[in-house]
Structures are given as C-alpha cells and as structure tokens.
Amino acid sequence: EKLIYVVNWRKVFPNARLIVPIDNTSLTKTFITAAEVLPLSRDEVSAKIFASYLFEFDVATYLFDLLTPAQADDDYDIQQHLLPAGNGFCGMAYSDVFVALKKQYNAILIGVSSIGPDGEYQLSKNPADNRLIESNDYLILILSGGSSNRLNEALQASIG
C-alpha cells in the first residue's frame, strides 16, 4: 500500500527526496528501485541500537545522545551546515577544515555532502584529507549545543 502511494506521489513530485517508514524489510530494494526513496525500518534501526547496548555500551550511550537534539550547551548533536559561497573554508582541504573546526569550535567534521555529476548530493563519510571543500557543500558535524550557535554565526551557514 505504501509503495503504491509513494510511486503515485513520485509522479506528481518527481524531484522530491523521500524517506519512507517500512514494516517489511524484504521490500527495501523494491522501494529503492521502484520509487527512488530511502526506506527506513524501525525494526532494523532498533536492532542495531540494541546490539550496540549489548556489546558496546558507551558507543550506544553516545549514539543516543547524538540522535536526540542538543538541549543544553553540553549536549551533543549531529548537524549539517550548508556552506555558502565566499566562506573562508571554501577551497580548503578537508583535513585543514577538520582541524580548524575542532580547534576553534570544538566541532568534529565527520563528512561532506556535495553535488555530484547527476546534480544530486552525494555523501562522503570521513573523506580523504586532500578533498577540497566547496561552496554549497554540506558539512556534517558532531558538536555541542554551545558550539552550534557560535559556528552558525562564524560560517554564515544554515543548518539543514
């Protein structure tokens, strides 16, 4: 039922990026190929978090903190920031931006999403040191609530 709805919705909004909750994980590939969506299974996500709690308790605790929005200055969050043209980080190597963000804002750069040849954003997790940061890249960061506001002002960037 969801697949039919999503396929029909896709006809009206062909360029929309969709995340669809699914109950039947055997339909994951079907959703990806037929409807061009990112299927999200609550059971798969829950199982991975549960396994972390069993075998890597500290990792699971940290993950839980990252999955919830930062409420206080010492809470941590994962955010993405769109880097506008003319920002000082544009044209710099990933490793240099990583070090600068850590030293200046106590933020950890964990990935970059940039426009690929097909015009869609492509996520690079922990890219090579020499990868150049460009305008309109999304910087994927782990940072505290206290660092977030300062970083927004300094980057002249928007979240999301």
What spans do the regions from the language model cover?
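Cytosolic regulatory regions of ion transport systems
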Residues: 1-160
